[in-house]
Amino acid sequence: MAEVRLTDIRKSYGSLEVIKGVNLEVSSGEFVVFVGPSGCGKSTLLRMIAGLEDISSGELTIGGTVMNDVDPSKRGIAMVFQTYALYPHMTVRENMGFALRFAGMAKDEIERRVNAAAKILELDALMDRKPKALSGGQRQRVAIGRAIVRQPDVFLFDEPLSNLDAELRVHMRVEIARLHKELNATIVYVTHDQVEAMTLADKIVVMRGGIVEQVGAPLALYDDPDNMFVAGFIGSPRMNFLPAVVIGQAEGGQVTVALKARPDTQLTVACATPPQGGDAVTVGVRPEHFLPAGSGDTQLTAHVDVVEHLGNTSYVYAHTVPGEQIIIEQEERRHGGRYGDEIAVGISAKTSFLFDASGRRIR
């Protein structure tokens, strides 16, 4: 396996710059996931690594070799797409070995590689079937097998699970994670689904508008986001954002904020660089960090809109004022109220986040 390094990578279409100076290092054997909303540039960046898109400026190296102008077939990469792209008239065995046959590899070596990949992917019993006789998950495993037999330095996955139903996506996430451990492969993976990113990645690259917002381990991004975009994108359900204003400062960098929708709900938070009195800020609270009424550092009242019961966990959708919705996660079937009920929850300063007017985290 090889490391991948991107140095000030940029991509423009005419005067429109879509990738804006990306710097990133993917270590050998690392599983890195590009995640972000549609149009953020994640697939374009992946295609630039693959050689399917030209690099306008910057430097791309794979295994220490500059690859900017190297033909895609000579970059030592294998790519798995959202569409399986299997040949319908070929069997699983023939599909997996096609690229090797096309390259003129010896028949016995092709057979050895195909059989080894089939064993890893548990496709042994399906080798003589054609794609129409396979499920969606099986077809995707064949597509992955076709990449494995090439023994690439780097695997590139472009939203490979998007065409699968929810149950199959969960199953294939487990399969891909297992595959990464077995092969110790360098993988760069693109998805819009932050759950995929959280469950698969060693390192997540959060993108927006062609720039990298933050890079880090999944739980590091969840626990310590740099800005409101990352805080809201990583985590499901998303973080609650409550507009507030700074109403007081104290020694030691502590500030007291009051929620705009509920001025009586006030919270004192310690900050290394405290904002000034009167500054507009936003308090961030994850759904699972709301506490039972009467506990925490302050209380917040809201009116229930909807309660979703998911077995042992419930999600309460409520509003503090019209148009300002919050989501409360409740465990152990705590009573979440019914439509129109007024409920109270506690908020702890230790589990709350503070953001300035630009959306940047105040630490």
UniProtKB/Swiss-Prot annotation:
Its transmembrane ranges are: none
What positions does the entry give for ATP binding?
A: G36, P37, S38, G39, C40, G41, K42, S43
Q: Which UniProt keywords apply?
A: ATP-binding, Cell inner membrane, Cell membrane, Membrane, Nucleotide-binding, Sugar transport, Transport
Per the database record, which ranges form the ABC transporter domain?
4-234
Q: Name one Pfam family in it.
A: ABC_tran
Location of this chain's protein in the cell? Cell inner membrane
Q: Which GO terms describe its cellular component?
A: ATP-binding cassette (ABC) transporter complex, substrate-binding subunit-containing; maltose transport complex
Q: Which domain of life is it from?
A: Bacteria
What GO molecular function annotations does the UniProt record carry, in alphabetical order? ABC-type maltose transporter activity; ATP binding; ATP hydrolysis activity
Q: Which InterPro entries match?
A: AAA+_ATPase (IPR003593), ABC_transporter-like_ATP-bd (IPR003439), ABC_transporter-like_CS (IPR017871), ABC_transpr_MalK-like (IPR015855), ABC_transpr_MalK/UgpC-like (IPR047641), Mo/tungstate-bd_C_term_dom (IPR008995), NA-bd_OB-fold (IPR012340), OB_MalK-like (IPR040582)
* Membrane-topology annotation of the record: Peripheral membrane protein
User: Is the keyword Nucleotide-binding in the record?
Assistant: yes
* Family annotation (Gene3D superfamilies): 2.40.50.100, Nucleic acid-binding proteins, P-loop containing nucleotide triphosphate hydrolases
- Please name the SUPFAM superfamilies in this protein's record: MOP-like, P-loop containing nucleoside triphosphate hydrolases
Matches recorded under PROSITE patterns:
ABC_TRANSPORTER_1, ABC_TRANSPORTER_2
Q: Which family does it belong to?
A: Belongs to the ABC transporter superfamily.
Annotated PANTHER family = MALTODEXTRIN IMPORT ATP-BINDING PROTEIN MSMX, MALTOSE_MALTODEXTRIN IMPORT ATP-BINDING PROTEIN MALK
Role description: Part of the binding-protein-dependent transport system for lactose. Probably responsible for energy coupling to the transport system.
State the name under which the record lists this protein: Lactose transport ATP-binding protein LacK
Q: Could you tell me which species this protein originates from?
A: Rhizobium radiobacter (Agrobacterium tumefaciens)
